[in-house]
Amino acid sequence: MVKDISILFLVIICFISCSTNISATNLSYTIPFQLIDDMVVIDISINGTSPLHFIFDTGTTTSLIDSISAQKTGLISDDTQGLLLNNDFLEMPIAKIKTLKTGNIVIENRPVIITQSFENYNRILGIPIHGIIGSDLFGKYITELNFDKSQIHLGRGIDTTGYEPINVRIYNDLFYIDATIFTSDTDSITNQFLFDSADMTAASLAQPFWTKHNLLSKSKSFYSGINRSSSSLTSPSYFANFKGFKLRNYSFKNTYLNLTSSKRGFFANDSIAGTIGIDILKRFNIIINMNNQKIYLKPNQKYNEPYRINTTGLRTRLNKDLTQCFIEAVLQQSPAEAAGLLQGDLLLSINDIKANKENISKIRQLTRSIPGTKLVFVIQRNNEIKEMTMICNTFSDK
Protein backbone atom coordinates (compact mmCIF):
# COMPACT_ATOMS: atom_id res chain seq x y z
CA MET A 1 0.00 0.00 0.00
CA VAL A 2 2.54 6.70 -2.73
CA LYS A 3 2.15 9.90 -4.76
CA ASP A 4 2.67 12.92 -2.70
CA ILE A 5 2.07 10.61 0.19
CA SER A 6 3.84 7.33 -0.27
CA ILE A 7 2.09 4.78 1.40
CA LEU A 8 3.03 1.14 0.51
CA PHE A 9 1.43 -1.39 2.84
CA LEU A 10 1.38 -4.72 1.02
CA VAL A 11 0.27 -7.88 2.76
CA ILE A 12 1.22 -11.07 0.95
CA ILE A 13 0.07 -14.10 2.92
CA CYS A 14 -1.41 -17.53 2.60
CA PHE A 15 -5.16 -17.31 2.10
CA ILE A 16 -7.13 -18.33 5.17
CA SER A 17 -9.59 -21.02 4.16
CA CYS A 18 -12.86 -20.50 5.94
CA SER A 19 -16.56 -21.15 5.85
CA THR A 20 -18.52 -17.95 5.35
CA ASN A 21 -22.28 -17.69 5.56
CA ILE A 22 -24.20 -14.89 3.80
CA SER A 23 -27.32 -14.09 5.80
CA ALA A 24 -29.11 -12.36 2.92
CA THR A 25 -30.57 -14.28 -0.01
CA ASN A 26 -30.09 -11.37 -2.42
CA LEU A 27 -27.08 -11.89 -4.68
CA SER A 28 -26.52 -8.20 -5.40
CA TYR A 29 -24.91 -6.01 -2.75
CA THR A 30 -23.92 -2.35 -2.59
CA ILE A 31 -21.23 -0.92 -0.31
CA PRO A 32 -20.85 2.89 -0.21
CA PHE A 33 -17.33 4.23 0.15
CA GLN A 34 -15.56 7.52 0.75
CA LEU A 35 -12.53 8.50 -1.32
CA ILE A 36 -10.38 10.18 1.33
CA ASP A 37 -7.16 11.58 -0.11
CA ASP A 38 -7.57 8.89 -2.78
CA MET A 39 -7.99 6.06 -0.28
CA VAL A 40 -11.12 3.89 -0.65
CA VAL A 41 -12.62 3.78 2.87
CA ILE A 42 -15.70 1.74 3.77
CA ASP A 43 -17.65 1.56 7.03
CA ILE A 44 -18.00 -1.86 8.64
CA SER A 45 -20.00 -2.87 11.70
CA ILE A 46 -18.51 -5.82 13.59
CA ASN A 47 -20.67 -7.88 15.95
CA GLY A 48 -23.30 -5.14 16.03
CA THR A 49 -20.99 -2.32 17.14
CA SER A 50 -20.81 1.20 15.69
CA PRO A 51 -19.24 1.32 12.20
CA LEU A 52 -15.46 1.30 11.92
CA HIS A 53 -13.34 2.67 9.05
CA PHE A 54 -11.68 0.03 6.85
CA ILE A 55 -9.52 0.54 3.77
CA PHE A 56 -10.58 -1.46 0.71
CA ASP A 57 -7.38 -2.99 -0.61
CA THR A 58 -7.11 -5.06 -3.80
CA GLY A 59 -3.46 -5.78 -2.91
CA THR A 60 -4.31 -7.75 0.24
CA THR A 61 -5.59 -11.30 0.53
CA THR A 62 -7.13 -11.18 3.97
CA SER A 63 -8.80 -8.86 6.45
CA LEU A 64 -6.94 -7.03 9.22
CA ILE A 65 -8.13 -5.18 12.31
CA ASP A 66 -6.14 -3.22 14.87
CA SER A 67 -5.85 -4.69 18.36
CA ILE A 68 -7.78 -1.92 20.15
CA SER A 69 -10.75 -2.24 17.78
CA ALA A 70 -10.59 -6.03 18.13
CA GLN A 71 -10.90 -5.70 21.88
CA LYS A 72 -13.77 -3.20 21.67
CA THR A 73 -15.74 -5.44 19.30
CA GLY A 74 -15.27 -8.54 21.44
CA LEU A 75 -12.88 -10.41 19.16
CA ILE A 76 -10.83 -13.10 20.88
CA SER A 77 -7.87 -14.77 19.17
CA ASP A 78 -7.92 -18.55 18.98
CA ASP A 79 -5.06 -19.18 16.54
CA THR A 80 -2.15 -17.53 14.70
CA GLN A 81 -1.27 -17.00 11.04
CA GLY A 82 2.03 -16.22 9.33
CA LEU A 83 2.00 -12.72 7.86
CA LEU A 84 4.51 -10.67 5.89
CA LEU A 85 4.03 -7.21 7.36
CA ASN A 86 6.30 -4.23 6.67
CA ASN A 87 8.89 -6.66 5.28
CA ASP A 88 8.98 -8.83 8.42
CA PHE A 89 7.43 -12.31 8.67
CA LEU A 90 5.37 -12.45 11.86
CA GLU A 91 3.00 -14.86 13.56
CA MET A 92 -0.18 -12.84 14.04
CA PRO A 93 -3.27 -13.66 16.14
CA ILE A 94 -6.49 -14.61 14.34
CA ALA A 95 -10.04 -14.11 15.57
CA LYS A 96 -13.43 -14.87 14.06
CA ILE A 97 -16.01 -12.15 13.49
CA LYS A 98 -19.51 -13.44 14.28
CA THR A 99 -21.25 -10.88 12.06
CA LEU A 100 -19.76 -8.33 9.67
CA LYS A 101 -22.08 -5.79 8.07
CA THR A 102 -21.11 -3.29 5.38
CA GLY A 103 -23.60 -1.68 3.04
CA ASN A 104 -26.45 -4.17 2.59
CA ILE A 105 -24.34 -7.30 2.97
CA VAL A 106 -24.05 -9.29 6.20
CA ILE A 107 -21.36 -11.95 6.50
CA GLU A 108 -21.04 -14.44 9.34
CA ASN A 109 -18.03 -16.26 10.76
CA ARG A 110 -15.39 -14.14 9.04
CA PRO A 111 -11.75 -14.69 10.12
CA VAL A 112 -9.63 -11.60 10.65
CA ILE A 113 -6.01 -11.06 11.61
CA ILE A 114 -5.38 -8.81 14.62
CA THR A 115 -2.46 -6.50 13.96
CA GLN A 116 -0.82 -3.28 15.09
CA SER A 117 -2.51 0.08 14.87
CA PHE A 118 -2.78 1.83 11.51
CA GLU A 119 -1.22 4.96 12.96
CA ASN A 120 0.35 6.19 9.77
CA TYR A 121 -2.92 6.00 7.85
CA ASN A 122 -4.63 7.85 10.72
CA ARG A 123 -2.08 10.66 10.63
CA ILE A 124 -2.23 10.95 6.85
CA LEU A 125 -6.00 10.74 6.33
CA GLY A 126 -7.12 12.59 9.46
CA ILE A 127 -9.55 9.86 10.52
CA PRO A 128 -9.02 6.69 12.57
CA ILE A 129 -8.46 3.65 10.37
CA HIS A 130 -9.41 0.43 12.13
CA GLY A 131 -8.61 -2.20 9.52
CA ILE A 132 -8.16 -3.37 5.96
CA ILE A 133 -10.47 -5.47 3.80
CA GLY A 134 -9.06 -7.44 0.87
CA SER A 135 -9.89 -10.17 -1.59
CA ASP A 136 -11.29 -12.48 1.09
CA LEU A 137 -14.38 -10.24 1.04
CA PHE A 138 -14.78 -9.53 -2.67
CA GLY A 139 -12.96 -12.44 -4.32
CA LYS A 140 -15.99 -14.74 -4.27
CA TYR A 141 -18.05 -12.21 -6.22
CA ILE A 142 -17.90 -10.28 -9.42
CA THR A 143 -16.97 -6.88 -8.00
CA GLU A 144 -17.48 -3.41 -9.42
CA LEU A 145 -15.48 -0.50 -8.01
CA ASN A 146 -17.48 2.49 -9.24
CA PHE A 147 -15.72 5.81 -8.58
CA ASP A 148 -18.48 7.81 -10.28
CA LYS A 149 -21.03 6.62 -7.70
CA SER A 150 -18.59 6.02 -4.81
CA GLN A 151 -19.96 2.50 -4.51
CA ILE A 152 -18.67 -1.06 -4.53
CA HIS A 153 -21.07 -3.58 -6.04
CA LEU A 154 -20.83 -7.31 -5.34
CA GLY A 155 -22.83 -9.85 -7.32
CA ARG A 156 -22.92 -13.00 -9.40
CA GLY A 157 -23.46 -11.04 -12.58
CA ILE A 158 -22.62 -7.39 -13.29
CA ASP A 159 -23.27 -5.65 -16.61
CA THR A 160 -19.96 -5.12 -18.46
CA THR A 161 -21.42 -3.10 -21.35
CA GLY A 162 -18.99 -0.34 -22.32
CA TYR A 163 -16.10 -1.87 -20.40
CA GLU A 164 -12.90 -3.19 -21.95
CA PRO A 165 -12.08 -6.77 -20.86
CA ILE A 166 -8.48 -7.50 -19.87
CA ASN A 167 -7.01 -10.86 -18.95
CA VAL A 168 -5.17 -10.96 -15.63
CA ARG A 169 -2.93 -13.46 -13.88
CA ILE A 170 -3.93 -14.72 -10.45
CA TYR A 171 -1.21 -15.59 -7.93
CA ASN A 172 -2.00 -16.27 -4.28
CA ASP A 173 -5.46 -14.75 -4.71
CA LEU A 174 -4.03 -11.46 -6.02
CA PHE A 175 -4.28 -10.32 -9.63
CA TYR A 176 -1.62 -8.93 -11.93
CA ILE A 177 -1.77 -7.20 -15.30
CA ASP A 178 0.77 -6.22 -17.94
CA ALA A 179 1.61 -2.53 -18.23
CA THR A 180 4.27 -0.59 -20.12
CA ILE A 181 6.68 2.16 -19.07
CA PHE A 182 7.93 4.44 -21.87
CA THR A 183 11.38 5.92 -21.30
CA SER A 184 11.42 7.61 -24.73
CA ASP A 185 9.39 7.71 -27.95
CA THR A 186 11.03 4.45 -29.06
CA ASP A 187 12.05 2.65 -25.85
CA SER A 188 9.66 0.88 -23.49
CA ILE A 189 9.53 -1.92 -20.92
CA THR A 190 6.52 -4.18 -20.33
CA ASN A 191 6.07 -6.31 -17.22
CA GLN A 192 3.42 -7.48 -14.79
CA PHE A 193 2.02 -5.23 -12.05
CA LEU A 194 -0.18 -5.93 -9.06
CA PHE A 195 -3.48 -4.01 -8.92
CA ASP A 196 -3.26 -2.26 -5.57
CA SER A 197 -5.96 0.22 -4.59
CA ALA A 198 -4.12 1.04 -1.34
CA ASP A 199 -1.01 2.28 -3.18
CA MET A 200 -1.51 6.03 -3.29
CA THR A 201 0.78 6.55 -6.29
CA ALA A 202 0.19 6.09 -10.01
CA ALA A 203 2.52 3.08 -9.86
CA SER A 204 5.31 1.84 -7.61
CA LEU A 205 8.29 -0.06 -8.99
CA ALA A 206 10.14 -2.85 -7.20
CA GLN A 207 13.82 -2.12 -6.63
CA PRO A 208 15.15 -5.18 -8.55
CA PHE A 209 13.04 -4.16 -11.56
CA TRP A 210 13.96 -0.48 -11.79
CA THR A 211 17.60 -1.21 -10.95
CA LYS A 212 17.86 -3.93 -13.60
CA HIS A 213 16.48 -1.61 -16.28
CA ASN A 214 18.40 1.44 -15.06
CA LEU A 215 15.16 3.40 -14.89
CA LEU A 216 16.34 6.17 -12.60
CA SER A 217 18.88 7.38 -15.15
CA LYS A 218 16.37 6.92 -17.99
CA SER A 219 13.75 9.11 -16.32
CA LYS A 220 13.16 12.68 -17.50
CA SER A 221 13.64 13.91 -13.93
CA PHE A 222 13.31 12.65 -10.38
CA TYR A 223 13.30 13.75 -6.77
CA SER A 224 13.98 11.90 -3.53
CA GLY A 225 11.03 11.02 -1.34
CA ILE A 226 9.83 8.82 1.49
CA ASN A 227 7.68 5.71 1.38
CA ARG A 228 5.24 5.42 4.25
CA SER A 229 3.80 2.15 5.45
CA SER A 230 0.63 1.70 7.50
CA SER A 231 2.70 1.95 10.65
CA SER A 232 5.20 4.69 11.37
CA LEU A 233 7.98 2.99 9.42
CA THR A 234 9.47 4.89 6.49
CA SER A 235 11.99 4.14 3.78
CA PRO A 236 13.62 6.32 1.12
CA SER A 237 12.42 6.26 -2.47
CA TYR A 238 12.49 8.26 -5.69
CA PHE A 239 9.65 9.79 -7.66
CA ALA A 240 10.67 9.71 -11.29
CA ASN A 241 9.01 11.33 -14.29
CA PHE A 242 8.73 9.12 -17.38
CA LYS A 243 7.66 9.73 -20.96
CA GLY A 244 4.56 7.64 -20.47
CA PHE A 245 2.80 4.74 -18.82
CA LYS A 246 0.36 2.50 -20.68
CA LEU A 247 -2.30 0.18 -19.33
CA ARG A 248 -3.74 -1.83 -22.21
CA ASN A 249 -5.15 0.81 -24.59
CA TYR A 250 -4.96 3.66 -22.09
CA SER A 251 -1.89 5.89 -22.18
CA PHE A 252 -0.79 8.37 -19.53
CA LYS A 253 1.83 10.97 -20.42
CA ASN A 254 4.54 12.46 -18.19
CA THR A 255 3.69 10.16 -15.31
CA TYR A 256 5.55 10.22 -12.00
CA LEU A 257 6.25 6.70 -10.73
CA ASN A 258 7.48 5.71 -7.29
CA LEU A 259 10.81 3.84 -7.30
CA THR A 260 10.86 1.94 -4.01
CA SER A 261 13.96 0.93 -2.08
CA SER A 262 12.71 -2.07 -0.07
CA LYS A 263 15.28 -4.84 0.20
CA ARG A 264 12.82 -7.34 1.69
CA GLY A 265 9.23 -8.32 1.08
CA PHE A 266 7.04 -7.66 -1.95
CA PHE A 267 9.10 -4.83 -3.44
CA ALA A 268 12.28 -6.88 -3.26
CA ASN A 269 10.71 -9.48 -5.58
CA ASP A 270 12.58 -9.73 -8.89
CA SER A 271 9.71 -11.47 -10.71
CA ILE A 272 7.35 -8.47 -10.82
CA ALA A 273 7.62 -4.84 -11.82
CA GLY A 274 5.58 -3.43 -8.94
CA THR A 275 2.06 -2.14 -8.37
CA ILE A 276 -0.45 -0.01 -10.22
CA GLY A 277 -1.86 2.40 -7.66
CA ILE A 278 -4.93 4.46 -7.01
CA ASP A 279 -3.77 7.54 -8.95
CA ILE A 280 -4.37 5.50 -12.10
CA LEU A 281 -7.05 3.08 -10.88
CA LYS A 282 -9.40 5.87 -9.71
CA ARG A 283 -9.66 7.05 -13.34
CA PHE A 284 -11.66 3.94 -14.23
CA ASN A 285 -14.75 2.19 -13.08
CA ILE A 286 -13.43 -1.33 -12.60
CA ILE A 287 -15.10 -4.73 -12.65
CA ILE A 288 -13.12 -7.61 -11.15
CA ASN A 289 -13.95 -11.23 -12.00
CA MET A 290 -11.43 -13.38 -10.16
CA ASN A 291 -13.02 -16.68 -11.23
CA ASN A 292 -12.68 -15.84 -14.94
CA GLN A 293 -9.32 -14.10 -14.43
CA LYS A 294 -10.53 -10.88 -16.03
CA ILE A 295 -10.92 -7.25 -15.13
CA TYR A 296 -12.98 -4.72 -17.06
CA LEU A 297 -12.09 -1.04 -17.35
CA LYS A 298 -14.17 1.98 -18.34
CA PRO A 299 -12.83 5.55 -18.07
CA ASN A 300 -14.85 7.60 -15.60
CA GLN A 301 -15.28 11.26 -14.64
CA LYS A 302 -11.85 11.31 -13.00
CA TYR A 303 -10.01 10.09 -16.10
CA ASN A 304 -8.56 13.49 -17.05
CA GLU A 305 -7.89 14.76 -13.53
CA PRO A 306 -4.38 16.13 -12.87
CA TYR A 307 -1.87 13.70 -11.39
CA ARG A 308 -0.69 13.85 -7.81
CA ILE A 309 2.61 15.66 -8.37
CA ASN A 310 4.36 17.28 -5.43
CA THR A 311 5.02 20.88 -6.49
CA THR A 312 6.07 22.19 -3.07
CA GLY A 313 8.60 19.63 -1.87
CA LEU A 314 7.13 19.25 1.57
CA ARG A 315 5.27 16.46 3.31
CA THR A 316 2.79 17.02 6.10
CA ARG A 317 1.47 14.70 8.77
CA LEU A 318 -0.78 14.99 11.80
CA ASN A 319 0.52 14.11 15.25
CA LYS A 320 -0.60 10.90 16.96
CA ASP A 321 -3.75 12.36 18.50
CA LEU A 322 -4.62 14.15 15.22
CA THR A 323 -4.69 17.60 16.87
CA GLN A 324 -1.74 19.29 15.11
CA CYS A 325 -0.17 19.19 11.66
CA PHE A 326 3.60 19.21 11.26
CA ILE A 327 5.95 19.46 8.31
CA GLU A 328 7.38 15.96 8.22
CA ALA A 329 9.98 16.51 5.51
CA VAL A 330 11.33 19.25 3.24
CA LEU A 331 12.84 17.89 0.04
CA GLN A 332 16.07 19.24 -1.36
CA GLN A 333 16.06 21.81 -4.19
CA SER A 334 12.32 22.28 -3.75
CA PRO A 335 10.16 25.42 -3.46
CA ALA A 336 9.61 24.58 0.22
CA GLU A 337 13.35 24.60 0.86
CA ALA A 338 13.73 27.88 -1.03
CA ALA A 339 10.90 29.42 1.01
CA GLY A 340 12.69 28.57 4.27
CA LEU A 341 10.29 25.93 5.60
CA LEU A 342 11.90 23.37 7.91
CA GLN A 343 11.19 19.83 9.01
CA GLY A 344 9.37 19.95 12.34
CA ASP A 345 7.62 23.29 11.74
CA LEU A 346 4.08 23.33 13.13
CA LEU A 347 1.86 24.10 10.15
CA LEU A 348 -1.06 26.36 11.07
CA SER A 349 -2.55 27.14 7.66
CA ILE A 350 -2.02 27.37 3.90
CA ASN A 351 -3.86 30.15 2.06
CA ASP A 352 -6.04 30.67 5.16
CA ILE A 353 -7.11 27.01 5.25
CA LYS A 354 -6.45 25.70 8.75
CA ALA A 355 -4.12 22.72 8.92
CA ASN A 356 -6.24 20.36 11.01
CA LYS A 357 -7.64 16.86 10.64
CA GLU A 358 -10.82 18.13 9.00
CA ASN A 359 -8.80 19.86 6.27
CA ILE A 360 -5.80 17.54 5.95
CA SER A 361 -6.86 16.34 2.48
CA LYS A 362 -7.27 19.96 1.31
CA ILE A 363 -3.86 20.82 2.75
CA ARG A 364 -2.26 17.96 0.88
CA GLN A 365 -4.03 18.96 -2.33
CA LEU A 366 -2.54 22.44 -1.98
CA THR A 367 0.96 20.94 -1.81
CA ARG A 368 0.18 19.46 -5.23
CA SER A 369 -1.06 22.71 -6.79
CA ILE A 370 -0.36 23.42 -10.45
CA PRO A 371 3.01 25.11 -11.14
CA GLY A 372 2.79 28.88 -10.73
CA THR A 373 0.31 28.74 -7.85
CA LYS A 374 1.12 31.08 -4.95
CA LEU A 375 0.84 29.56 -1.48
CA VAL A 376 1.04 31.47 1.80
CA PHE A 377 2.09 29.34 4.78
CA VAL A 378 1.60 30.25 8.41
CA ILE A 379 3.83 28.18 10.68
CA GLN A 380 4.99 28.14 14.27
CA ARG A 381 8.69 27.65 15.02
CA ASN A 382 10.24 28.02 18.47
CA ASN A 383 7.00 29.58 19.76
CA GLU A 384 7.14 32.24 17.03
CA ILE A 385 4.48 32.61 14.32
CA LYS A 386 5.94 33.08 10.84
CA GLU A 387 4.39 33.69 7.41
CA MET A 388 6.17 32.35 4.35
CA THR A 389 5.30 32.47 0.67
CA MET A 390 6.21 30.13 -2.16
CA ILE A 391 5.41 29.65 -5.83
CA CYS A 392 4.66 26.01 -6.67
CA ASN A 393 6.82 24.40 -9.32
CA THR A 394 8.24 21.07 -10.36
CA PHE A 395 11.71 20.30 -9.06
CA SER A 396 14.34 17.65 -9.59
CA ASP A 397 17.51 16.10 -8.20
CA LYS A 398 18.57 15.32 -11.78
Segments and roles (model prediction):
Residues 1-29:
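Bacterial Sec-dependent N-terminal signal peptides
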Residues 18-398:
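Pepsin/retropepsin-fold aspartyl endopeptidases
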